[in-house]
């Protein structure tokens, strides 16, 4: 790695530590030439599959879209940001684990509902009502009845 201060190509690692629950490595480095120290973070570059929408169009996976949907569902509910981030991480891990280059948006929606049902039942019903396009009260009743099983 080039030194950010003098652009020398020779640097040495002084200290390495795992951070972000072991998903990243933090390294303290020192330039052999100018002796400046700096920190780098190293993590695996994990490629997410493309999303195939219901109309057949394809688009890149958008984590912010997923986060936004979950935040809307849990709005004003007793769910912490840590719980939300853990759920998003589980969804992303499941998508990567498929090994597929493309996944259907329906799969992502179902994974989201699986996470929400464990986080907060009201948030699950909110999300399901939009995702499954509930038309009347009876569909809400069916979804609630399924939760009580």
Swiss-Prot record:
Pfam families: ATP-cone, Zn_ribbon_NrdR. Binds 1 zinc ion. The keyword Glycoprotein does not apply. The keyword Zinc applies. Keywords: ATP-binding, DNA-binding, Metal-binding, Nucleotide-binding, Repressor, Transcription, Transcription regulation, Zinc, Zinc-finger. One of its GO terms (molecular function) is DNA binding. PROSITE patterns: ATP_CONE. GO terms for biological process: negative regulation of DNA-templated transcription. A zinc finger (unnamed) spans 3-34. Residues 49-139 form the ATP-cone domain. Its cofactor is Zn(2+). Negatively regulates transcription of bacterial ribonucleotide reductase nrd genes and operons by binding to NrdR-boxes. Belongs to the NrdR family. This is Transcriptional repressor NrdR.
